[in-house]
Amino acid sequence: MAKDLKKPKDEAKSKKWVATLMIVFASIGLLASFVLSVDAFTLLKDSDTQLACNLNAALNCVEVMKTPQSEILFGIPNSFFGMMAFPVLITIGVMIAIGARLPKWFKTCMQLGVLGGLAFAWWMFFDSLYVIGVLCPWCLTVTTGMTIIFGAVTHYNLRENTFDFKRPTYDKILKFLNADGDKLIWATVLVIFAFLAFAKFGIALFE
């Protein structure tokens, strides 16, 4: 039954969709990481400088970048790690796009890697929202991008049955994916995040 659910045309379309999302949003994440890294050096020279991403009282990169949470490992700005990780994701996206056959161990490591990135991005979002009390626009870009990338990679690995599900379970997973159930879940997550931000700051987000 799984073979009937995995139509070659659908598989090709799915891989193209996954690859496109990975390349596009990893590129956006790389841009955000680069800008934040440049801004980090700017702040070192002048801690009172005003950056372009200081939009209002609720959306302010500088206030977030001045906190310990912006440098959680060895005093290195978090954005530096993004500049190392996102090119890897872009490369993997290209590999999927050209039809490369990725080994199981590689796909498993890829899943664990994006899970780690998602966990960090979500932690930074909630910490900024409820502890720091200010949101960083570029950080929000990374959070959105990592959520979409994680969803895309998970979709890819589920279709590839990287985790060796039994046939009945795998059939159900394929039906769920074919019905775009996973896309609905991740879209809902992003809507919830937007709602939480609005609930916290209200109209201040747009002032």
Residue ranges and their predicted role:
Residues A2-K15, E160-D180:
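Membrane-interfacial, low-structure loops and terminal tails that flank and connect transmembrane helices
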Residues N178-A204:
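Final/C-terminal transmembrane alpha-helix of multipass membrane proteins
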Residues F41-Q50, A119-M146, A199-E207:
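Interfacial helix-loop-helix junctions of multi-pass membrane proteins
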